Amino acid sequence: MAKTLYEKLFDAHVVYEAAGETPILYINRHLIHEVTSPQAFDGLRVAGRQVRQIGKTFGTMDHSISTQVRDVNKLEGQAKIQVLELAKNCEASGISLFDMQTKEQGIVHVMGPEQGLTLPGMTIVCGDSHTATHGAFGALAFGIGTSEVEHVLATQTLKQARAKSMKVEVRGKVNPGITAKDIVLAIIGKTTMAGGTGHVVEFYGEAIRDLSMEGRMTVCNMAIEFGAKAGLVAPDETTFAYLKDRPHAPKGKDWDDAVEYWKTLKSDDDAVFDSVVVLEAKDIAPQVTWGTNPGQVIGIDQVVPNPQEMADPVTKASAEKALAYIGLDANTDMKNIPVDQVFIGSCTNSRIEDLRAAAAVMKGRKKADNVKRVLVVPGSGLVKEQAEKEGLDKIFIEAGAEWRNPGCSMCLGMNDDRLGEWERCASTSNRNFEGRQGRNGRTHLVSPAMAAAAAMFGKFVDIRHVELN
């Protein structure tokens, strides 16, 4: 019987499935951070349980840490408590932790692939909704809640119902200036933020295959933003080249054997998907969100939609509410919207490829006077090291940006990088919900190049018309 890649991955990890019961899956890799793990470890202690397989769980510090200081003793309040608890729990359990004193530390979904902890064919979980990022490697990766974090620590398994399968095909090649972020925002714009609910999505098409691993991670990272459980890209030579010689990747004959197996990880030609979505790559323009969810997105060459022209009453009401919050009028040209802050970072767009794209725009230019602050936050210590080796940090600083240490930063209002009330931000992150970047902050999601251009010109501009250096 023909199977999709998702079905192959799921079936290969079923430990036990009783009639009428939810299957139990084996979990190959468990990634943890300081926010969703403390209660899980407390639960283990109360129950008198140990971590079952310490070699399959790895920790990092990312969400609540400061991107300005590397000393845990200089953290304040809840952030300090969370970081200290993670360090204590990992040490007591024997779990490997990439803390703030190591260059391997970084955002969990950047650190995992960099270290070769993310491999094709794996099941990967983390107490974080953007765990779908790791699906770019042909791994079944999804976010879990804190009680499930405890269960995986204790058993290395998880009850998991089968999802439906969705195929998203992006046909042909994108035009110059169009990035992975534009591709996935265009997908979400077409499907809406609920279009993938109940599905695991596999991304297909020439435009997807042309992407680097960094680009594929961006696409899979935002699968959750149109409701999908997980996102997948079948592994290929691009995948293998990225993983070869990573610290935790197989070596020698084990590598050769692994690659032979990984090559089988693809949907069968006659596999049937429950849902299919098709986009033409040539039609995708640089994307900018105009509302308060990632599905409220248009091309930079378009105007803000008019809710009065929307037939569906729910969509209309949502658009009216979004525009009231975001402070825009219908039919506003997206290129006439000024920004107060710019954030380049997050698990969506903080890898070296993203920083190079931003630097190409910012080189030889200066931050616009109306832009109060530009934060450039690398996704890991290794990304930071590579960027500095290439001189990208100097480009950012000379342009008027702040070059920070690794962390989740302004993606979410959980640390000391936040928007002021009603400030408008061009952000490379993944969510533009109300208050996501700070109380009453207004977020517009864009690619790294588009964010950099907004910083230099003080408003959204079409990156296709910006000379790169």
Curated annotation (Swiss-Prot):
Family to which this protein belongs: Belongs to the aconitase/IPM isomerase family. LeuC type 1 subfamily.
Catalytic activity: (2R,3S)-3-isopropylmalate = (2S)-2-isopropylmalate
Requisite cofactors: [4Fe-4S] cluster
Residues that bind [4Fe-4S] cluster: C347, C408, C411
Description of how the protein assembles with itself and partners: Heterodimer of LeuC and LeuD.
Function: Catalyzes the isomerization between 2-isopropylmalate and 3-isopropylmalate, via the formation of 2-isopropylmaleate.
Pathway(s) where this gene product acts: Amino-acid biosynthesis; L-leucine biosynthesis; L-leucine from 3-methyl-2-oxobutanoate: step 2/4
Protein name: 3-isopropylmalate dehydratase large subunit
Superkingdom per UniProt: Bacteria
Cofactor descriptive note: Binds 1 [4Fe-4S] cluster per subunit.
Nucleus among keywords: no
Disulfide bond recorded as keyword: no
GO aspect biological process, one term: L-leucine biosynthetic process
Source organism of the structure: Actinobacillus pleuropneumoniae serotype 3 (strain JL03)
